[in-house]
Structure formats: C-alpha cells, structure tokens
Amino acid sequence: MSSYLFTSESVSEGHPDKVADQISDAVLDAILTQDQRARVACETMVKTGVAIVAGEITTSAWIDLEALTRKVITDIGYDSSDVGFDGATCGVLNLIGKQSPHIAQGVDRKKPEEMGAGDQGLMFGYATNETDSYMPAAIHLSHRLVEQQAKIRKKKNSPLSWLRPDAKSQVTLRYENGVVSAIDAVVLSTQHAPGIKQKDLIEAVREEIIKPVLPAKWLHKGTKFHINPTGKFEIGGPVGDCGLTGRKIIVDTYGGWARHGGGAFSGKDPSKVDRSAAYAARYVAKNVVAAGLADRCEVQVSYAIGVAEPTSISVTTFGTGKISDDKIEKLIRKHFDLRPYGIIKMLDLIHPMYQQTAAYGHFGRKPKEFSYLNGEGETVNATAFSWEKTDRAAALRADAKLK
C-alpha cells in the first residue's frame, strides 16, 4: 500500500504580501470600473509606515490612488498604531508610469479576436475530484483556516477580539493509495494583542478556528497541532515583514500540488495571459474533471508576445483519464477558445472583481453574481470567479461519448 504525506500552506488577508496583492487589485478594479480598455500592471510594496504603488498603467480613468490604498489597508484591519500599521496615517508613494507602446502594438489589433498575448509565458490549470471545490485538499483546508481566522476576528463582539490581521496556516495530509486518509499535522500562527496567555490562545484557536473547519473524519489521536509554536506573535503585518505583490503564487494557486509557470496574478488586467490564461486553464481542467473524463487533470498553455494563438496546449491526467490524454486535448481545442480575446470573452473578465481574488486563493471559490456602476453611471451585472463554473462539463462528456 502506497502511503505518503503532502503539505500546503495559506496566509491571511493581513499577511503583508497579501496586503500588497489586495492594493494592486483594488487599483485594477477602480480603473476597470471606468475604462474597460485600460492596460494595468500594478505592483505594490508595503513596509512600516508606507505603501509604494508602482507599475505601468495606460488608461483614460482617474482614480484617487492615495484614498484607495488607505481604504484597502484599513478595511483589512490595519487601522491603528496599536496594531503596528495605520492606513489613515501611513505614507502612500505613487510611482506609476505608462505601458510601453511597443507592447501595445503587439496586443491591440483592429479585429478584437486577433488580440495578441501581452507577453510570452506558460500557465497551468489543475483540478481534482478529491474535494467538492475540485481543489487539492491541503490547500483547500489551509485557505479555510485563515478565512475562518479573519471571520472570527471581524465578528461583532468576537470572543477572540485580541486577534490581529496577520496569520498563516499549514495542513499536512496523509494519502493512502492516492486518497486522503488523515490529517497528520496542522499549523496555525496568528498575530495577537499583547498580554494573551499562550494556553488561552491555543484553546481559543483550536475551538473557534480549527475545529469548525477541519473534517472530523480525517482527525485522529495522532494529529499534531502547532498553534503559535514560537509562543508570541505580537509584531506582524508590514511592520514585521515587507510585503510585495506577487510573492504568494503557490498560495494563490494549488498549494504546490500542480506545476506553476511563474507568473503572478494581482494587479494585472486580463490582457496579461499570466492571469487570464491561468484562469482559463483552471476552467478547462475543472470542466474536464467535472465531466468525468478524469479524476485529476493538469492543463498547460503557452503564448508568444503579440501572437493570438497559443504556442502549445498540453494535458496530463496522471493515469486517471477515462479516455486518452490525446483525446482530451482534442476536445479542449474544440470546446474552448484559448486565444487572449477568446478567454476574456468566454470568462467575461473585464469587470472590477479582482480584489476579492487577492486573498484565500484565486481557485476553488464559488462563482458570485454582482453588479456595479460603470464610468457612465450604468448598472452592469457580472460574475466573479466565472472560471469556477462547470457549465461545459455536460458538452465535454457528451462529445467524449461517455455514458
């Protein structure tokens, strides 16, 4: 019998790298609200007392960058010097320039469907049927732990009012013959106010954060819990560590279970295939698994800058396919348009929905209907996490001629 351990981690919305991601995506959202043709590549750095927002942006929109940055920081919970960082008083430095016209000439075309990729690169998408979210279980549970930490922290009259925004989680699972059999270890580190006794913190975190999230069927007497194992975690957020956009690409995707092309997501408009093609690859892989064509599926796509058609599409199902990987690849080419314009249209990506992707994972989330007012004051309806739909599974299954 094959037995092995696998570990994934996640971080909270108050982790400094995630603060940076959320600022970058808030800038993108604010611009897309007014200008759907904008080109945005926004990078953020946060450190004690300052947020630096830089990058290349070409747009007709105007946004109050300073006010927007401050709002993101305070909404996360960094709203006082008592927590070490205050969005109301920190410095905000604007270092934004315009996108190179040489890139623009390769992307923008007279015919929208001929739109070229914004850069070269390779992207991966993955799905598995081991969880209802079609995500690997370790990253799924790691996200839910830090999400629960934030939920309890922000709750009115919270029993854990001493929680602070910064937190990290890690889950180690035991697999037997490729199937999750148990949770071997859990790590939960959370920033907290001074004066909290370690014993009280451990008990509260276990009862209010860990127990509501982890499946009881996978817990056993030997499961190890490491809660704030250093003893104190009072200094956190941008004071404890410098935060940068794009530093949590494994947390953002599949927790190390699938391969990664190296490109980050946050702060990039959908013309950047680092983001849009990774979303499309997840959409494809999830529909393949939801269709029952495989238990696990990884899809790779690649692009050349200024070229519309992908330079490659490849599929691997790790021996779990009900039909051959070659046949699945042919079905993908038939049912999905993976040119940049095709992806944007297929997933309806040009809407202000990206800040909510910047914490707790870009994948494994439920599609969410919402509406907003655009630059003309019109109400627009849209769907966030559209790449999590399984609306093409039935057609794939029928075309594969599976009963």
From Swiss-Prot:
Give the pathway annotation: Amino-acid biosynthesis; S-adenosyl-L-methionine biosynthesis; S-adenosyl-L-methionine from L-methionine: step 1/1
Q: What keywords are assigned to this protein?
A: ATP-binding, Cytoplasm, Magnesium, Metal-binding, Nucleotide-binding, One-carbon metabolism, Potassium, Transferase
- Name its GO BP terms in alphabetical order: one-carbon metabolic process; S-adenosylmethionine biosynthetic process
The residues the record assigns to binding ATP are: H15, D166, A167, K168, K232, F233, D241, R247, K248, A264, K268
Quickly give the catalysed reaction: L-methionine + ATP + H2O = S-adenosyl-L-methionine + phosphate + diphosphate
Q: Which gene encodes it?
A: metK
Source lineage: Bacteria, Pseudomonadati, Pseudomonadota, Gammaproteobacteria, Lysobacterales
The entry's function note states: Catalyzes the formation of S-adenosylmethionine (AdoMet) from methionine and ATP. The overall synthetic reaction is composed of two sequential steps, AdoMet formation and the subsequent tripolyphosphate hydrolysis which occurs prior to release of AdoMet from the enzyme.
Concerning Pfam families, the annotation shows:
S-AdoMet_synt_C, S-AdoMet_synt_M, S-AdoMet_synt_N
Report residues binding L-methionine: E56, Q99, D241, K272
Binding residues for Mg(2+):
D17
- Specify whether Heme is a keyword of the entry: no
Question: Which EC class is the enzyme in?
Answer: transferase
Family stated for the protein in its record: Belongs to the AdoMet synthase family.
**A GO molecular-function annotation:** magnesium ion binding
* Cofactor dependency: Mg(2+); K(+)
Copy out the cofactor comment.
Binds 2 divalent ions per subunit.
EC number(s) stated in the UniProt entry for this protein: 2.5.1.6
Claim: Transferase is one of the keywords in the record: yes
Q: Where does K(+) bind?
A: E43
Protein name in the entry: S-adenosylmethionine synthase
Q: What is its quaternary makeup?
A: Homotetramer; dimer of dimers.
Region Flexible loop: start and end of each range? 99-109
Task: Quote the subcellular location field of this record.
Answer: Cytoplasm
Q: Which GO terms describe its cellular component?
A: cytoplasm
> What superkingdom heads the lineage?
Bacteria
